[in-house]
Amino acid sequence: MLRLLPLTLAEVQRFQSTKEPPDLAQCLLTGFYPRIHDKGLNPSQALADYFATYVERDLRQIAAVHDLQRFERFVRLCAGRTGQLLNLNSLGNDAGVSHVTARAWIDLLQTSYIVHLLPPWFTNTGKRLVKAPKLYFYDVGLACWLLGLRTPEQVARDPLWGSLFENFIIMEAMKDRLNAGESAQMYFYRNAEGNEVDLLLPVGTKMHAIEIKAGATVNPDYFKGLKTFAAHHPLTLTSGGVIFGGAQSQNRSDWPVHSWLALRNKP
């Protein structure tokens, strides 16, 4: 099945008239839907129109969602859980719907390419360290809009800043794999002690591990999850590194640190 995903950061750069590096918060706020960049639209208004069309027209046609106001609240609650483990009971309770309805609505959001559920990685024995997937949006700009964020300053100050950056990088990785004709299957890692790697990309029978950090300066804690995964699964790890919110990539002794701006140069 053909997936028409939002643009990549590299594709968005083709619409820019300046060679100046983009502002990270503005990138997250604007998102990557082609029409916004092609026509130079105001992202807040364009995303409002997009969501209204999706809810009011498309949902009436493709699904029996009768309580549109409650469904909209449900989607906004999903945005508030960006980057978190999916808990349908909690999500349903907060939205005022049953677990069954919450599951049906999540499935609907998946099939209409609004949200993506990133599964946990499991060993060859089938043992999962956690069972729940993590929730992300196909377009981080839509997540920002659903959260009520309307300016880059609001995005940069929001408590979900790190999760929104993580969402952005994970979707860039998915688009990169699909554009290269590879499987979109990706995972995250979390062990019983809570050590986590944000993204595992299959490379043959092994994994490339990526830790994602929104901070503009490198912190030694950024490497904790990578070190844990390497220690526990040395035969699985083929390579790894950190993608962070700083402007300059760095070569560290154990793990390379890549600036998010390097994604502009992807083919």
Question: Residue spans of the language-model regions?
Answer:
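Short beta-strand/turn micro-motifs composed of small residues
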Residues: 190, 213, 243-244
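Domain-level recognition of nuclease-like catalytic cores that cleave nucleotide substrates
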Residues: 245-267
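Catalytic core segments in nucleotide and nucleic-acid processing enzymes
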Residues: 223-232, 243-246
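Amphipathic alpha-helical "lid/sensor" segments that cap RecA-like P-loop NTPase cores
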Residues: 17-53, 61
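Short beta-strand-loop-alpha-helix junction that forms the active-site gateway
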Residues: 212-220
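Arginine/glycine-rich "motif VI" loop of SF2 helicases in the C-terminal RecA-like domain
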Residues: 178-179, 228-236
